[in-house]
Amino acid sequence: MLIPVGTGVGVTSVSLGVVRAMERHGVNVSFFKPVAQPRPGETGTERSTAVIRAAANINPPEPFALSYAENMITSSNTDILLEEIVARFEEHVKASGAEVLVIEGMVPTDKQPFANKLNYDVAKALDADMVFVTH
């Protein structure tokens, strides 16, 4: 799981680079972003998911909406959110047949102070190795 340590580290670029490198080496790879994190004013498909769809031969699932995740976390339903993330992840693994899934974590920001904890919880729930993305 690629986990950005802050804003502006280029986690989407790193995700795309890892996916493309694996594809070039013949690895059956896919991509998963558990929770969308749109920039102010953005609408439609989450940016990382859209970039991966456009640049690679991959059709990743839609991430959960940020507002949904925030609501689940603030109403003490993080465990349910994690169960739903795991279920979506497992469905995608089964549907894609991928050997490797590149998982992109949330960027920690002032507006999403829960991002680091959620990234850790998601990585733990998915039994994913954590790779920190820095400058």
Q: Residue locations for each model-derived region?
A:
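A short, structure-level motif marking secondary-structure boundaries and short turns
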Residues: L2-V5, I103-G105
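Conserved beta-strand elements of the Class I
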Residues: M1, S30, D129-F132
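Phosphate/Mg2+-binding loops and adjacent switch elements
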Residues: L82-H135
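N-terminal phosphate/diphosphate-binding loop that engages ATP/GTP or pyrophosphate donors
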Residues: I3-K94, D110
